Swiss-Prot record:
This is Ribosomal protein L11 methyltransferase. Pfam families: PrmA. Gene3D superfamilies: Vaccinia Virus protein VP39. GO terms for molecular function: protein-lysine N-methyltransferase activity. It comes from Haemophilus influenzae (strain 86-028NP). It catalyses: L-lysyl-[protein] + 3 S-adenosyl-L-methionine = N(6),N(6),N(6)-trimethyl-L-lysyl-[protein] + 3 S-adenosyl-L-homocysteine + 3 H(+). Belongs to the methyltransferase superfamily. PrmA family. Its EC number is 2.1.1.-. The gene is prmA. Its main location: cytoplasm. It is found in: Cytoplasm. One of its GO terms (biological process) is methylation. It is an enzyme of class 2 (transferase).
Length: 295
């Protein structure tokens, strides 16, 4: 069966309203896509997990009168002269198979591979993390996640404790455990992230060494040898008092989710208590690492 797709450029403020309206007028499915290839990170409590510039994509069956759909969208003021949209016919495909074909094992550093569960691992002697793309939030494909994974791979984590602050899928905590860490803690504001991290830890056989907490439920005396936080520059600066207290004396800190243009302001926030290393840059994103200073 063929389908007709309409794609409308919108904003995160309007996307959900448009989605609801499209479903009311007969769409069989509605999805959101980033208009500018920017990543989604953890939202603040109560916020919708959307991009700043969002495309709303709706599928209708092939017999749908799309001129009438456009008329209804305009009548409801979801389309105007400033709204870009595109209508096209879509072939029926095995969408699940096509989606799966897009994901391949990826290597980070010298030892670490992230592999979808339906793929054979390229090196059985490597450190292999099995992680399937899904609703939560980090599978290694974005430069910030890659920078953090490569940093963890470069550390000697044997018998170390690790905190993954803003754990999302749990990818960083799980990678640390499989790279030799004694134990890890994942912290997030989103209950869905806690569930996803636990599921992924079970899949990788490390759930017995991973503790998970919502951010407002973490122990007050929590500290670790290594702390990694892949969130955003603004929250990293705002959360400096909290994040810095999580690092043991001489412990390692890794921060990412930071645009290169924001690196200096984040460094300025942390340099008072951390001896920072040169900033690592990939594409327009960067990673800041350092050690907690001791008096």
């Amino acid at each position: 069966m063929a389908w007709i797709q309409i794609r409308l450029n919108s904003t995160n403020e309007k996307a959900e309203q448009i989605s609801d309206f499209l479903e009311e007028i007969g769409s069989v499915s509605v999805t959101f896509m980033d208009s500018q290839d920017t990543p989604i990170f953890e939202p603040l409590p109560g916020e919708t997990r959307l991009w700043g510039n969002t495309d709303v994509i709706a599928l209708f069956d092939a017999e749908t009168d799309m001129a009438e759909i456009v008329r209804l969208l305009k009548e409801a003021k979801h389309l105007d002269s400033n709204t870009a949209y595109k209508i096209e016919q879509i072939e029926d495909k095995d969408w699940e198979r096509e989606w799966m074909d897009n994901f391949h094992p990826m290597q980070f550093g010298k030892r670490l591979w992230i592999c979808p569960s339906w793929r054979d691992v390229p090196d059985k002697n490597a450190v292999n993390v099995m992680l399937d793309p899904g609703l939560a939030f980090g599978t290694g494909t974005h430069p910030t996640t890659a920078l953090c994974l490569e940093w963890l791979d470069s550390l000697d984590l044997k018998n170390k404790t690790v905190i993954d602050f803003g754990c999302g899928s749990g990818i960083l905590a799980i990678a640390a455990l499989k790279l030799g860490a004694k134990s890890a803690v994942g912290i997030d504001i989103d209950p869905q992230a806690i569930l996803a991290s636990r599921d992924n830890a079970e899949q990788n056989g490390v759930v017995d060494r991973l503790q998970l907490f919502l951010s407002d439920e973490k122990p007050s005396d929590l500290k670790a040898d290594v702390v990694v936080a892949n969130i955003l520059a603004g929250p990293l600066k705002e959360l400096y008092p909290i994040i810095s207290q999580l690092v043991k004396p001489n412990g390692n800190l890794g921060l990412s989710g930071i645009l290169e243009t924001q690196a200096q302001s984040v460094c300025d926030a942390y340099t008072q208590t951390f001896a920072l290393e040169p900033v690592a840059v990939r594409e327009e994103w960067c990673r800041i690492t350092g050690n907690l200073k001791t008096l």
